[in-house]
């Protein structure tokens, strides 16, 4: 491969020819599928040609090698262009490319990690750069390796605020191994992008965010090579390349024309245009990428053991969010690849304990939750880290799309929500996570933990660290009593029956603070000669349906659920779904019924919303009378 400083005419021609071959592949594939975005592919053909066959270092036969340079296609609708590059690199056959978007083909309309050369799923715009930031941060500060990260964005998606959160993050951490390429083709999906072709405005904005910035003609391969070469020389700043391009480049009467987004060319026109583009190809040569510079350290992130048992005594009063902070610090001792990302509330959520003990593995993302989740997804790619994302549970709702895309990315990130439920008290409704269980229960392959004391919280942290797929741990601000001994064993999907006798009349299921309300209710009811079974589900997803059904049948089908969460999507609905095949089981649900309008103490709010011990007692008596 020629160096950009001595780029010869032959190399320039080969790169231009490769760009045109990428156009041909993209047009053919989208025509074959009858759907797709050929015009979005054509605008970035030269960019991808230069990246894959001149600038990036990688092993073609090992796309996921840890030392390879990374590429993130943030404008995921241009997936055929990415697949075309891998056709030219020899990893995909041309016939396979023609199966684009078919049910048995991994070449989807937007890229996902079902493909070995895709690290994160994209397609929901504005998220690729945040993931690229996570990869670059891992490379620079954790792996201390030579690999670089390139992210291709569309101009339309740069309207997303998450893009600018990522720009701020990369600048703050001096990610000089990161290059963002803005494909400024002027057109969005349904019309003109807000900044049109005003590349100077893009430059000014990127520079204001602390990036080295270069303006280039995005269809000039020589200029692109030079810009990428300059980016490689930059120190302590990320680089933005603002590439002026034209949507549908090379397609007569379509180039720079509106109303062609997401439309394949009619077959008769496509054949003619392919012949035209092919006539401009002067060589049949290819360029091989340079091999990567090896240097990424070997990592092991499986089978992590507790360094010691939880250090709590039954009866100790500890908030589960504090127990989580302490457990995470212990986990950091057990494995040096544990990384924590914080959204700024570390001083009130006990995440600063981890920062104090493992500062080199604590990533402050500030109040930018969307970017924080995207960065975490990037950090976790290629099995480089065990990643925990920490903030108030209410604020994770802002990042739901990033979390959703994380599931599509088959990511193993762990998210922890603190200050959950009305038990936050005087801070008011804006701080109360009351939708979080519904949100995370809806995420495929996501394990949802709801620990009820410090011991179970510590076990939840270790189980999450060793789990495949995404995990969510819900924690509370209120101090609650430790109810389990340090020797207690916990499993995902296995509930704990806390109170049980042969005379139980009703099964009561609570979790977190409401489990303690249920235990208080059980004590009060026992004074009235009414015995109840009390279950701690531990994980809300998967739910231990077998234990719940068994206990419910033993109490003549009478079940009461109580939760510090809205009814929709919460514990009650999860239990109803679990027992839906058992017509003799009837579930009475207690849950938060509305938004708190007043500042009250946690105990007062639990009572106001009908999820206190007093209301559990009333519900038990009601079920016994009906």
Swiss-Prot record:
The keyword Magnesium applies. Keywords: Calcium, Magnesium, Metal-binding, Thiamine pyrophosphate, Transferase. The record marks 37, 261 as: Important for catalytic activity. Plays an essential role in total transketolase activity and cell proliferation in cancer cells; after transfection with anti-TKTL1 siRNA, total transketolase activity dramatically decreases and proliferation was significantly inhibited in cancer cells. Plays a pivotal role in carcinogenesis. Its cofactor is Mg(2+); Ca(2+); Mn(2+); Co(2+). SMART domains: Transket_pyr. GO terms for molecular function: metal ion binding; thiamine pyrophosphate binding; transketolase activity. Mg(2+) binds at residues 155, 185, 187. PANTHER family: TRANSKETOLASE, TRANSKETOLASE-LIKE PROTEIN 2. This is Transketolase-like protein 2. It comes from Bos taurus (Bovine). Pfam families: Transket_pyr, Transketolase_C, Transketolase_N.
């Amino acid at each position: 491969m020629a160096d950009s400083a001595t780029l010869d005419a032959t190399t320039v021609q080969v790169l231009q020819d490769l760009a045109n071959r990428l156009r041909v592949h993209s047009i053919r594939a989208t025509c074959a599928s009858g759907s797709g975005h050929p015009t979005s592919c054509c605008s970035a053909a030269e960019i991808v040609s230069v990246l894959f066959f001149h600038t990036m270092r990688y092993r073609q036969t090992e796309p996921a090698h840890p030392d390879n340079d990374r590429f993130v296609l943030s404008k995921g609708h241009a997936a055929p262009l990415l697949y075309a590059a891998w056709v030219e690199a020899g990893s995909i056959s041309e016939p396979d490319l023609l199966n684009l978007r078919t049910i048995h083909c991994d070449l989807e309309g937007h890229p996902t990690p079902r493909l070995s050369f895709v690290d994160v799923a994209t397609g929901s715009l504005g998220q690729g750069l945040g993931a690229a930031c996570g990869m670059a941060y891992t490379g620079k500060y954790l792996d201390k390796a030579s690999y670089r990260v390139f992210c291709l964005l569309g101009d339309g998606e740069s309207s997303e605020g998450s893009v600018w959160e990522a720009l701020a993050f990369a600048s703050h951490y001096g990610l000089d191994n990161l290059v963002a390429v803005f494909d400024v083709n002027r057109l969005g999906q349904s019309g003109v992008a807000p900044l049109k072709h005003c590349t100077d405005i893009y430059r000014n904005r990127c520079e204001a965010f602390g990036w080295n910035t270069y303006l280039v003609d995005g269809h000039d391969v020589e200029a692109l090579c030079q810009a990428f070469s300059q980016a490689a020389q930059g120190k302590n700043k990320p680089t933005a390349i603002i590439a002026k391009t034209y949507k549908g480049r090379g397609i007569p009467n379509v180039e720079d024309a509106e109303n062609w987004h997401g439309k394949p060319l009619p077959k008769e026109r496509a054949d003619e245009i392919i012949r035209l583009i092919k006539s401009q190809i002067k060589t049949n040569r290819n360029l091989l990428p340079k091999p990567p510079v090896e240097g990424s350290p070997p990592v092991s992130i499986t089978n992590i053991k507790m360094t010691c048992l939880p250090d709590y005594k039954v009866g100790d009063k500890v908030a589960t969010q504090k127990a989580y902070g302490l457990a995470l610090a212990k986990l950091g001792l057990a494995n040096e690849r544990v990384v924590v990302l914080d959204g700024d509330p570390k001083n009130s959520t006990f995440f600063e304990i981890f920062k104090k003990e493992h500062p080199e593995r604590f990533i402050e993302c500030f109040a930018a939750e969307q970017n924080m989740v995207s960065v975490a997804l990037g950090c976790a790619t290629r099995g480089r880290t065990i990643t925990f994302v920490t903030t108030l549970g209410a604020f994770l709702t802002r990042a739901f799309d990033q979390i959703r895309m994380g599931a599509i990315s088959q990511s193993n990130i762990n998210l922890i929500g603190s200050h959950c439920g009305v038990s936050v008290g005087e801070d008011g409704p804006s701080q109360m996570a009351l939708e979080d269980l519904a949100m995370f229960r809806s995420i495929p392959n996501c394990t949802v933990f709801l620990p009820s004391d410090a011991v179970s919280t510590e076990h939840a942290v270790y189980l999450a660290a060793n789990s495949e797929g995404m995990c969510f741990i819900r924690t509370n601000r209120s101090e609650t009593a430790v109810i389990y001994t340090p020797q207690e064993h916990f499993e995902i999907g296995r509930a704990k029956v806390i109170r049980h006798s042969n005379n139980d009349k009703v099964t009561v299921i609570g979790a977190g603070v409401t489990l303690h309300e249920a235990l208080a209710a059980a004590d009060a009811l026992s004074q009235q000669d009414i015995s109840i079974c009390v279950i701690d589900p531990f994980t809300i997803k998967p739910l231990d349906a077998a234990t719940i059904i068994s206990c419910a049948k033993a109490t003549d089908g009478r079940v009461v659920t109580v939760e510090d969460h809205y009814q929709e999507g919460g514990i009650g609905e999860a239990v109803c779904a679990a027992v839906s095949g058992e017509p003799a089981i009837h579930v009475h649900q207690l849950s938060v019924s509305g938004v708190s309008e007043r500042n009250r103490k946690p105990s007062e709010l639990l009572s106001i919303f009908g999820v206190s011990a007093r209301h559990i007692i009333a519900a038990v008596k009601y079920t016994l009378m009906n």
